[in-house]
Amino acid sequence: MLTDRRVILRNGVGVIARVLQRRELLLTRIAVDQPTLMVVRRGLKLLRAAGTETVIPAGGAAAIAGGEVFDVVNRPDSGIYAADFLVIDQAVIAGFAVPDAVRPIARALAIPAMAPDFLEAYERARAAVADPAAVPETVAVQRMREVLGWIAHHGGAFPPPVPPAIAQRIRVLVAGDLAAPWRAAEVASQLAMSEATLRRRLAAEGTSLTDLVTETRMAHALMLLQVTDQPVATVAALVGYDSPSRFAARFRQRFGHPPGAIRDQTESAAIRDQTEPVPAPAPNPAPTRLSA
């Protein structure tokens, strides 16, 4: 089993990462932008959306359609929650022949227990992402399709991709350079529209550029805290905050917990004691992205 504390991307194939968490936390409005298979190794995961709750126990998995938003609870077992995820590239999904009887996944497909062969296929797919030198791309893609076959066996298939909303396109832009100031003129130019059109389109989607930039930074901060061992101060710098204390204040404002709570570590205790005030959040903040 791969246990690297980092995010690994293989273009055209997929993304993998492993999450460790030591206390139970409720994280609200977490967006899963891409089709993802989440596997719980230890503890319990709860996904809540639209009045429903999906429970994934240890040894189980959830196949999540892209573009979904959940409230997430990761519940440790004896002090440890461990999970990992596999994001499958859209091109791989597009090339997979879905059996006629299989329906598109609506939000999330719960798989309470993974058969040994399914788990082996999943591990082989993760290994293909982690070690491109050892696994040719054609083989890596085939391993991904085997995982899709197992998901289909459980009655679901990832729906075909749809054109992304403006907000999602902006999140992708911001993620490419989290420290950039991202002014409206530059964003509008990159999206080939006027500033007025940009503001109007974002208003129609119930968000703003300021909210999206902040949310994207917080999303990546959450991911880095969950899947790497980098210090909180380093994470703050990576997502565009020169001041660790201001970062900690913004993080607490968004998630209701200080950064150190994600790992139940004390490294940010001094930061938490010196947090700077930040402006009040919008009433309905844009969703933060993937948290396994």
Where are these regions (language model features)?
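N-terminal regulatory/effector-sensing and dimerization cores
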Residues: 7-105
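Short hydrophobic/aromatic patches on the structural cores and recognition surfaces of FHA
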Residues: 43, 59, 198, 221, ...
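A short, Lys/Arg-enriched amphipathic alpha-helix from helix-turn-helix/homeodomain DNA-binding modules
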Residues: 114-123, 140, 160-182, 189-191, ...
